Amino acid sequence: MTTPHTPDPHELAALRERYRLERERRVRPDGAAQYRDADAEFGYYAADPHTEGPADRAPLHDLVDVVVIGGGFGGILTGARLRQQGVARVRIVEKGGDFGGTWYWNRYPGVHCDVESHVYLPMLDETGYVPEWKYAPGDEIRRHAVRIATRFDLYADALFSTGVTALTWDEASETWLVSTDRGDDFRAAYVVSATGTLTDPKLPGIPGIEDFAGHTFHTSRWDYAYTGGTPEGGMTRLVDKRVGIVGTGATGIQAIPMLAEDAGHLYVFQRTPSTVDERANRRTVPGDVGAGRAGWASERRDNFLRIVSGESAGRDLVADRWTTSAGLLEKLLPSFRRHGDRHTFEAAYEAADAAKMNELRARVDRCVTDPEAAEKLKPWYRYACKRPTFSDLYYPAFNRDNVTLVDTADTHGIERVTADGVVVGGTAYALDCLIFATGFNVGTSGIHSGRLPVRGRDGVHLLDRWRRQGPRTLHGFTSNGFPNLIQLGTLQNASSVNFTHILDEQAVHVAALVAAAEADDALIEPSPASEEAWLAVLAEGAPDHEWFHAECTPGYYNREGRGRPNGPIAYPHGAVAFHRLLGEWREKSLSEVLRSRTVPRA
């Protein structure tokens, strides 16, 4: 590939203006309120298509050591690391019918991971498994989740098709009362929230959505009974169907090429095009990744994290589009490590960003034969405004006669849904099937959604307290007034594009906290002073990203165009440094969060 042209100041100014105009075409006054939850009258969009229904069982009223809310990789890894620390009674509560989390739910055609499988799949060293593909399909990932759960005996106490509805601290017993939608009221010495960020599907609030007389579903609940086929394709029941799909983000990029092959006619309704870089997926053998060496997977995973976090790494073991574009992730990740003078960095960043985006727009012209369609598919915004996507199949799908791209930018999305189809720009599109690839309520699942009330000491409601004074944690995990409650996620810690690595580091930390508390017959609870000190760490050196996201095209990164305010939301020196900090803290300062019990552990 030729070296990208570096734009001059006049070209950069022209790009800024084009980006502004394209953003204004898409910003809606209702912001994130344009979406609705898949609940109440729309609850069927979130129903589980992979199980016939919850298995009959009596409600539980027992006591466990640890309850983990969520059976995705966060919950599985927490359970596994707790087992390694000798914790016996671990109960994972999961809304789905099996382990897997987002990989249990997302089985749409073409589903793959967008991070290399040899770094994405956790515990490869421990299980001895070597992925079969550079970028694993969903089924391989789901099977690995089950492999880990089986290896660490996590099925023994697991509750599937069960949602936690309330967490209440009982001071008299110093345990948490856990209530579920299956009538359970059991107790746990510790609670770990691992509900993930890609679990609750969202729908566009299009007028008339409930009036559609055809078939409809969300991609995270794919209806193969209607389409036929499998995630590998073969949707033979669509051969005579007019299919519409709404959404061209990470899911749409993967599902659209498969639908294009099988549908009688496919209409793709696009508000904002994604960046779509090359994928170059292929089968792999152990020798490709040095899998014969002890610790090979941890080495590869650590190498990838260093590069995409802005650290030096010597050589690039993964060598894909994530790593070669790593410098542009600074605006995507609040916890990216930055170097040098701010002004110099921003100038160089803008030039590199423009060169990369010009390269990606040129790729559209090379892949799409129709100039009008190609122009609609070009992304006019900065690289980190949306999560990058990767596919070698997406653009060629628009060269097919049975695929129509419908641009909805000027109408701020589909105008309305009718019994027969949808209307965009005054044009009616008749459909037999309408599929929503509209994503999830990112970052608002579980405790943060408000649908899971958590009451700590003196009946204090966690979210009420945070609404009044802002989130208060130590390292993002624990909070004063909520003993033995530990949260996984991205709040006030560090994240990265390879989220399973982050989750595994968090699981190791959780297991160490629980093991220390058990050894000392103690409760885990930071002091208010510890929380304040951590807020100060987060605030010092926090990135100024507010202006960047305010200029971005609308999406979930900037609250649909409302911007993302600066603040103490993430550790500002990178995930590698954060993991190092946690390790040193566990060695030297963990006892600071241990408080003596007043009631003996049952």
Regions found by a protein language model. Give the residues of each.
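Conserved class I S-adenosyl-L-methionine
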Residues: V243
